[in-house]
């Protein structure tokens, strides 16, 4: 299983958001959960003047958390990533995350 990091594109494989994809905003390693952009939104009620970011208060919609076991890393073409390693591509100077996919059976 590929390690999930902030900024990765993931697909939800279980739960009420199953089949949807999004970008990881935060990884909560201690809790075993991730926050995915625009998925599992929760409503928070905030009093007026409690936050500099939202001085008017009101009802905020924030991304909730999803169990890390319920998401899977997908590549740029929306296909699942099977193996991943850190290394250099041919001719590249910087290290990057290289992804390998399972070969298609014929």
Swiss-Prot record:
The species this protein was found in: Anaeromyxobacter dehalogenans (strain 2CP-C)
Record keyword RNA-binding present: yes
Subunit and interaction comment: Part of the 50S ribosomal subunit.
GO molecular function: rRNA binding; structural constituent of ribosome
Family stated for the protein in its record: Belongs to the universal ribosomal protein uL24 family.
Function summary: One of two assembly initiator proteins, it binds directly to the 5'-end of the 23S rRNA, where it nucleates assembly of the 50S subunit.
Location of the region described as Disordered in the Swiss-Prot/TrEMBL record: 84-106
Cross-referenced InterPro entries: KOW (IPR005824), Rib_uL2_dom2 (IPR014722), Ribosomal_uL24 (IPR003256), Ribosomal_uL24_CS (IPR005825), Ribosomal_uL24_KOW (IPR041988), Translation_prot_SH3-like_sf (IPR008991)
Protein name per the record: Large ribosomal subunit protein uL24
GO biological-process terms attached to the record: translation
Pfam families: KOW, ribosomal_L24
Keywords attached to this entry: Ribonucleoprotein, Ribosomal protein, RNA-binding, rRNA-binding
């Amino acid at each position: 299983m590929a390690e999930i990091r902030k900024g990765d594109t993931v697909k939800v494989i279980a739960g009420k958001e199953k089949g949807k994809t999004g970008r990881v905003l935060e990884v909560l390693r201690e809790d075993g959960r991730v926050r995915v952009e625009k998925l599992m939104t929760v409503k928070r009620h905030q009093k007026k003047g409690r936050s500099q970011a939202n001085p008017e208060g009101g009802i905020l919609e924030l991304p909730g958390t999803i169990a890390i076991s319920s998401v899977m890393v997908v590549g740029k073409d929306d296909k699942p990533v099977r193996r991943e390693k850190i290394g250099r591509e041919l001719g590249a100077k910087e290290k990057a995350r290289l992804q390998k996919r399972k070969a298609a059976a014929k």
